[in-house]
Regions:
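A phosphate-binding catalytic loop at a beta-strand-loop-alpha-helix junction
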Residues: 1-7
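Signature of N6-adenine DNA methyltransferases within the class I
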Residues: 8, 41-44, 52, 56-62, ...
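Short mixed-charge
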Residues: 9-26, 56-74
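A compositional/structural signature marking long, glycine- and acidic/polar-rich segments
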Residues: 12-28, 182, 188-189, 195-197
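Extended charged low-complexity segments that act as oligomerization/scaffolding linkers
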Residues: 24-32, 74-82
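Conserved SAM-binding motif I beta-strand of class I
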Residues: 34-37
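Conserved SAM-binding loop
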Residues: 47
Length: 202
């Protein structure tokens, strides 16, 4: 959000420098431009509050008056749900009419920035349950069975870019993303696109 607001603010200032008639306007971008999916209830609410705090800090730092009444507003565009598999409220996979598990849909966006959960493939059944893990692998049959959980986010982002639904994506992962079955997910991205600004051991 802060980067988006910085870009908009800089554009307004440059427009004003070109012509006084293009005087800098009040920022239009705000928390409503930030969409998100978070499974944990506490983390979802924390994300909503963090976005609002960032908004208030940016407005004050750049000489604008922040909202006062109320200071924080509901932010329903950060959803509390599974990001890779359609599940019910108990976290059980929901099957379609043909009895198949379904990939979760992501909100329409231009850019995705994600910090997916890190869980090795050998721990998925013990941590997520056998039914969930089997359903996840069935729904994402293009992801190798031995891939870590984080790979489903990489595959999801790339699939959307490949069909023009997404412009860019930035993901956080561990170094294990470069090895084993995980590497196959990266290979499909490199074969059809490009990975840049990849920072190792950060």
């Amino acid at each position: 959000l802060l980067a988006l607001k910085d870009i908009e603010h800089l554009t307004n200032l440059e427009a004003e420098a070109i012509s006084p008639s293009l005087a800098a306007q009040f920022p239009n971008s705000g928390p409503e431009n930030v969409l998100g999916i978070e499974l944990n209830t506490y983390a979802a609410e924390l994300a909503r509050v963090s976005v609002w705090i960032g908004e208030i800090q940016w407005m004050r730092r750049n000489g604008f008056e922040a909202a006062k009444n109320p200071i924080l507003k509901p932010l329903g565009n950060i959803e509390k749900r599974d990001a890779v598999l359609v599940t019910d409220e108990q976290g059980n996979p929901v099957l379609d009419a043909e009895g198949k598990p379904q990939r979760a849909k992501w909100p329409k966006a231009d850019v995705v920035v994600g910090n997916p959960p890190f869980l090795g493939d050998k721990k998925m059944i013990s941590e997520l349950g056998e039914d969930y893990t089997i359903a996840l692998r069935r729904a994402w049959s293009d992801v190798p069975g031995g891939a870590d959980l984080v790979c489903y986010w990489f595959a999801g982002a790339w699939r959307r870019m490949a069909i023009g639904e997404l412009e860019r994506a930035g993901m956080v992962s561990t170094n294990s993303i470069r090895a084993g079955a995980n590497r196959e997910v990266l290979k499909s991205i490199v074969d059809g696109g490009q990975i840049f600004e990849a920072w190792g051991d950060e």
